[in-house]
Design a protein with these regions (language model features):
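Compositionally biased terminal segments of proteins
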Residues: 1-167
Length: 167
């Protein structure tokens, strides 16, 4: 089980925005991470969550942009030579498209410009001709039993988040 706590910088911790600090809570693969978010992302999580048993749980409306940002950030850091687990990058990518299958057909909230840019950049990284779609499709088939059309799923994300069409 993994628990992630989201916060804004309190000014007392010297971390880069978006930096993740894992904290192992048990020897049996449980972990706890505290993630410092940019204000726009923090506000998104606060506004778009589901309360279950008194706990606010981020929903697809906030998780998709967060996962897209994590993919962009970790891909950038990997390209700059940083040691990044490629499985985590692939998981963020697949999570975006898996969560997109749960979005309603009606448009969602208007995102702040910073987040709109990030989600658009993420979608532009997966044109329908991308060789990654084979792996994405296999991942979705294994986890949710669904096959996806790249054009349809990227268009659904763009429509829900009110983004310009991507190709």
């Amino acid at each position: 089980m993994e628990i992630e706590l989201f916060s804004r910088s309190a000014g007392r911790i010297d971390l880069d925005p978006g930096e993740i600090v894992p904290v192992v809570v048990a020897p049996d693969n449980h972990s706890l991470s505290a993630i410092l978010l940019h204000d726009a992302y923090y506000d998104l999580v606060r506004q778009h969550n589901d309360v279950i048993d008194g706990l606010a749980i981020a929903n697809a409306t906030s998780l998709i942009p967060l996962k897209a940002y994590a993919w962009l950030d970790q891909t950038r850091r990997l390209s700059q030579g940083e040691q990044i687990d490629s499985r985590k990058i692939k998981k963020h990518r697949s999570d975006v498209f898996r969560l997109a299958l749960t979005l309603p057909a009606t448009p969602g909230p208007r995102l702040p410009e910073e987040i709109r840019v990030d989600v658009t950049r993420f979608l532009e990284s997966f044109p329908v001709t991308s060789p990654e779609w084979g792996e994405i499709s296999r991942s979705l088939a294994a986890t949710v039993g669904a096959s996806v059309d790249p054009t349809e799923i990227t268009a659904a994300i763009a429509a829900y988040f009110r983004l310009s069409p991507t190709g």
